[in-house]
Structure formats: structure tokens, C-alpha cells
Amino acid sequence: MAAKRKSKGVYMISAVAEMYEIHPQTLRLYEREGLLKPSRTEGNTRYYTDEDLERLEFILNLARDLGVNMAGIAIILQMRER
């Protein structure tokens, strides 16, 4: 389910939501739950890097394709980081 990225860089929440066909609130929820950690500008705007998008793709694969709930995703991400 890889979204097409035009170039390396940073992406605003609206662009990421459109690329992955998800609601911006979903991205905010993932951040609130600690699944994603986008950087922020001084004005508090979220910016997602290519690494954030790779992590999002992994999260969406777990949730959509495998049916893993958010608690399960959090555990899998923790295990993956070790």
C-alpha cells in the first residue's frame, strides 16, 4: 500500500492524509497514542518525514491488512525498535 512520493522531504498532515486516503484525525490519533511522532514547526504545524511515512505504511498494513488493533500495533512497534 505504498503511496507515491514525488521527492524526499517533509509533508504536512493534509498531504499525508490525502496520499494514504485516511482522515487527518487518524494521523492525530496515531500521534496521541504514540504510534507516530512527527516533528513540529515553531507554529506547531506537524511535518512528516519519509521515515514517518514508512512507519505509517507499516502501521496501516498492520491495521488494514492484518486486523491488528492499536494496542497490538504499539507492542509490535516497541518490539521492532529493540
Q: For each of these PLM feature ranges, what is it?
A:
Residues 23-26:
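Short coil turns linking two alpha-helices in DNA-binding domains
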